[in-house]
């Protein structure tokens, strides 16, 4: 797993704070605070969902309380074992992953991971996923009474490596609207909700409008692109699941265009 970009961002932020502190007597200050909809963060750097699980992996490299927030790996209602291995394959400008939403389920996640994050005072955005709209609502309901360190929810309606492609809600405005509406009704008020959009659509703007109309505070753009890598030694797909989600520098121009 490549941690260089996030670690480098942390180094840059730390350096800016040191410079600011060292020159405070000269009236020089650096304000890194960022506002995402209703959500106010002290710094603009967030981890991408999936890259750091619940954040424990990154804690050996940095103080997680120094970045804007940790975005957790997407959590389902029930535990899931995920896909067979191999699950990851490197590409020239990124990597493919085919994890299959492996996770402990929301109850165990709250008991173990969220307690650890709260203990370490880590601002957290919990990413949630579901097999149907009702499941999204049930997970959101369980997050209503968690600690104050949970500052928002990312609603993953676009994971491209789930075996049944029929469950990708982000491909249609109507289904995307339905999921966000249920989450908003369940969580209530102006609590920050961000819809994670899929690049595998012909009109991402219509999807974005639908989720905002349904109550989303903003959108997370973009999820991985579906791809495949061939193992030229074995002459077969490198991933056990055949296809996987492409992430990394290769998809940045696609995200910017969206």
Report the location of each language-model feature.
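Alpha/beta enzyme core
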Residues: 137-258
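N-terminal active-site wall of soluble small-molecule enzyme domains
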Residues: 34, 38, 135, 202-204
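Short, conserved acidic/polar surface loops in the N-terminal third of protein domains
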Residues: 81-85, 110, 136-139, 165-167
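N-terminal capping/small domains of soluble enzymes
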Residues: 11-124, 129-131
């Amino acid at each position: 797993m490549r941690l260089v970009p996030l670690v480098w961002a942390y180094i840059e932020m730390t350096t800016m704070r040191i410079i600011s502190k060292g020159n405070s007597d000269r009236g020089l200050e650096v304000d890194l605070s960022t506002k995402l909809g209703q959500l106010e963060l002290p710094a603009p750097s967030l981890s991408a969902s999936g890259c750091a699980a619940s954040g424990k992996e990154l804690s050996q490299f940095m103080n997680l309380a120094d970045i804007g927030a940790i975005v957790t790996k997407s959590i389902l209602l029930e535990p899931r074992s995920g896909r067979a291995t191999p699950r990851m394959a490197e590409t020239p400008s990124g990597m493919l992953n085919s994890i299959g939403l492996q996770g402990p389920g929301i109850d165990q996640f709250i008991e173990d991971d969220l307690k650890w994050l709260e203990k370490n005072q880590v601002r957290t955005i919990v990413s949630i996923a579901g097999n149907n709209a009702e499941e999204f609502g049930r997970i959101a309901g369980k997050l209503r009474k968690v600690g104050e360190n949970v500052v928002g929810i990312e609603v993953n309606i676009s994971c491209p490596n789930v075996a049944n492609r029929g469950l990708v809600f982000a491909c249609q405005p109507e289904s995307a609207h339905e999921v966000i509406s249920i989450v908003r009704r369940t969580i209530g008020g102006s609590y920050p909700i961000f819809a994670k959009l899929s690049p595998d659509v012909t009109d991402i703007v219509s999807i974005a409008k639908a989720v905002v109309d349904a109550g989303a505070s903003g959108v997370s753009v973009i999820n991985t692109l579906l791809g495949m890598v061939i193992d030229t030694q074995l002459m077969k797909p490198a991933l056990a699941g055949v296809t996987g989600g492409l992430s990394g520098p290769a998809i940045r121009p696609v995200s910017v265009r969206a």
